[in-house]
């Protein structure tokens, strides 16, 4: 606890000493010198049983002669920087303590001596002199607490000057007491906290405690100490409270104390359970204020102070991680313990591949010299060859510093790499932090970089030649530069071809859909593919005064939605046992669950993939969420209903299982959970009409989303609106802020990926990344992007996997989607709207031709690409069988929906409703 600068009284004349025995001040110094002072708590100085002398404090100083907390002030003149020590001996006004401060340049040493004699004479010896008879030396280092830590550099010790440290946080300490009632023990603890100047807040229930913690975190006023009444589990479940606090964001270093009955200390299982739940220390109940005060003092020094220091280390780790220089830390056996982000880029490896690796695995050079020098506490400085993953070695200047954390032998080695000037090009091509603003050097990093985007960032008059001379090392810049160099030394024909290539590279949307040529004699396929892959802008945006077909203001009806009986129906359970099989009968599940396939299948998938534990949520919350999501799928839709959602979710689960079995690019638990959630909600509240229809009818959703990705944006938005709108179904409520943000981003991205207008773009990117014959090495530059591509392709294939299902399921899905398209065409005719798919007329449409075109132009390439990645040959097998069947129907003249139903009766609940 610092105090304001003080002023010394005028110094006595040269050779004159004051009545306190002070040494004379230099005559060149001003009479009034600005001084810094440290307040010393009297609790640090134990009173002696023997009498001492009474010394009077300065008459005009700031010393305290009254009060129990302070024994006075020690004044230090920063101008005292002589080579030898000058001493200011000041008394505290107490009979038992003398405080001496020695100023040696910028180093200050403070000692406290206690008088042990009873002669009544004052001890005046310094730390460098001989003690007078009747006195003994007693040097006590001042262990300052955070609130006492001086902020001026003059109070740093010699070790701090050699190895500068970051001061720990220095806020006013706050304590939260969780007691079900304010009894005598609670009052004693409160008084002890107040004695040590802690700001105390008392709450009386778990809910009130958690609410207080959340509010304090929101206002950046966290509690440093939480004391929980653990004497009776009937009143407060201390174990549950402690565990909940530990899982609350921002409280992993909060000190938690449990007040227990004395009898608990005879039962180690009770105390161990509390400690395992996150309690730092268990203390026995007592109403003795002195005992509470001493116990609290120990906690402040032995737990809270170290926790503050530990929290400060995060600043150092963050600084290390963001350094452009490469930093490695190993143990004494040369096993890598830490690597920063620059190391990841240098070695072309992920951090989890680097940590715990032997250092010899990344160096080509012999490391014996380093080991020998570091054993003798000598630094190493030399050139070593670093082995990058899948690339040749690079000679680099390396400095190695041994550090002895415990004892005198080195426990860690710090490696610092300097990249030689000739090897700097590799660092510029690697991705930089995402948070870098667009237009900065760090933002120029993706393969889809468009040269023209530079113009929007203030370089409008920069030519391409000048651009390539800048230190912008994006891959597209290198490609253009290399092609320009090749063009200078090639024939005229080759130069013209390169010009065309350069022109394509300068365009936006390198992966934009390129429609394959469709036979002009196949108008149905033309209509279908055109409607799926073309944006709504090609249609007229005719205004209509008709009401929107989208329901608005629908409320969350949790209680009325969940089926009355959701017991373990043996038929349902037997069917769900095969829920990960590609032959799973989703239509049978639709029938036996009475139109609730998503609820039952969703709960089964959540259990199989441990989603409850991943989201840290109760099963009933997930059940309620699935029920609400399913209720917002419209039963009036023949295709885009909850059965389709359940089918996509089932396919997603099957794909995740296959990825796990192959141990290739395995998704983590959170990615699996978000993929299943996205699949379940990817078409929620679908109106049974296409985005083009909504745009043509001037629907409110089309206006809201500017005619762009209308339905998919609505599905993603309504998913989070429903989820966050009711705490009873909020499956994300126990996630921390960063995890929720990441999960939300993944779910939205996967739902938007189901939009067919970007089908070829996603497919082309996926093939360009995963289409190589050679196995792909892990690369931290692209792992995140490839994971995104993989998740997008996963849900895309799951969404349109109907032609790759067993034939009876494929035909039923074709019947349902055709019926939905027919209903849209009927409404377009009735409302005099542009006909999006004119050939989808129920009287004239050829279902086989539409499916043949869909497989040829959409499904075939995507299924082959996905199957080669995931290794599920049944996808191709079923697709070929179904394609042959549709060809056969077409040759037989089986075209209309009625004819198809006669050949292949509908299956599932929808069949019974016809």
Curated annotation (Swiss-Prot):
<dbReference type="InterPro" id="IPR023088">
    <property type="entry name" value="PDEase"/>
</dbReference>
<dbReference type="GO" id="GO:0046872">
    <property type="term" value="F:metal ion binding"/>
</dbReference>
<feature type="binding site">
    <location>
        <position position="799"/>
    </location>
    <ligand>
        <name>a divalent metal cation 1</name>
    </ligand>
</feature>
<feature type="domain" description="PAS">
    <location>
        <begin position="312"/>
        <end position="359"/>
    </location>
</feature>
<dbReference type="InterPro" id="IPR000014">
    <property type="entry name" value="PAS"/>
</dbReference>
<comment type="function">
    <text>Hydrolyzes the second messenger cAMP, which is a key regulator of many important physiological processes. Involved in the positive regulation of MAP kinase signaling and in inhibiting oxidative stress-induced cell death.</text>
</comment>
<feature type="region of interest" description="Disordered">
    <location>
        <begin position="113"/>
        <end position="138"/>
    </location>
</feature>
<dbReference type="GO" id="GO:0070374">
    <property type="term" value="P:positive regulation of ERK1 and ERK2 cascade"/>
</dbReference>
<feature type="binding site">
    <location>
        <position position="683"/>
    </location>
    <ligand>
        <name>a divalent metal cation 2</name>
    </ligand>
</feature>
<feature type="binding site">
    <location>
        <position position="644"/>
    </location>
    <ligand>
        <name>a divalent metal cation 1</name>
    </ligand>
</feature>
<dbReference type="GO" id="GO:0004115">
    <property type="term" value="F:3',5'-cyclic-AMP phosphodiesterase activity"/>
</dbReference>
<protein>
    <recommendedName>
        <fullName>High affinity cAMP-specific and IBMX-insensitive 3',5'-cyclic phosphodiesterase 8</fullName>
        <ecNumber>3.1.4.53</ecNumber>
    </recommendedName>
</protein>
<keyword id="KW-0114">cAMP</keyword>
<dbReference type="Pfam" id="PF00233">
    <property type="entry name" value="PDEase_I"/>
</dbReference>
<dbReference type="GO" id="GO:0019933">
    <property type="term" value="P:cAMP-mediated signaling"/>
</dbReference>
<dbReference type="InterPro" id="IPR035965">
    <property type="entry name" value="PAS-like_dom_sf"/>
</dbReference>
<feature type="binding site">
    <location>
        <position position="683"/>
    </location>
    <ligand>
        <name>a divalent metal cation 1</name>
    </ligand>
</feature>
<dbReference type="GO" id="GO:0007498">
    <property type="term" value="P:mesoderm development"/>
</dbReference>
<feature type="region of interest" description="Disordered">
    <location>
        <begin position="1"/>
        <end position="27"/>
    </location>
</feature>
<feature type="domain" description="PDEase">
    <location>
        <begin position="558"/>
        <end position="893"/>
    </location>
</feature>
<dbReference type="Pfam" id="PF23198">
    <property type="entry name" value="PDE8A_N"/>
</dbReference>
<dbReference type="InterPro" id="IPR036971">
    <property type="entry name" value="PDEase_catalytic_dom_sf"/>
</dbReference>
<dbReference type="InterPro" id="IPR002073">
    <property type="entry name" value="PDEase_catalytic_dom"/>
</dbReference>
<comment type="pathway">
    <text>Purine metabolism; 3',5'-cyclic AMP degradation; AMP from 3',5'-cyclic AMP: step 1/1.</text>
</comment>
<dbReference type="GO" id="GO:0047555">
    <property type="term" value="F:3',5'-cyclic-GMP phosphodiesterase activity"/>
</dbReference>
<keyword id="KW-0378">Hydrolase</keyword>
<feature type="active site" description="Proton donor">
    <location>
        <position position="640"/>
    </location>
</feature>
<dbReference type="GO" id="GO:0046058">
    <property type="term" value="P:cAMP metabolic process"/>
</dbReference>
<dbReference type="InterPro" id="IPR003607">
    <property type="entry name" value="HD/PDEase_dom"/>
</dbReference>
<comment type="similarity">
    <text>Belongs to the cyclic nucleotide phosphodiesterase family. PDE8 subfamily.</text>
</comment>
<dbReference type="Pfam" id="PF13426">
    <property type="entry name" value="PAS_9"/>
</dbReference>
<feature type="binding site">
    <location>
        <position position="682"/>
    </location>
    <ligand>
        <name>a divalent metal cation 1</name>
    </ligand>
</feature>
<keyword id="KW-0479">Metal-binding</keyword>
<feature type="compositionally biased region" description="Low complexity">
    <location>
        <begin position="116"/>
        <end position="129"/>
    </location>
</feature>
<dbReference type="GO" id="GO:0006198">
    <property type="term" value="P:cAMP catabolic process"/>
</dbReference>
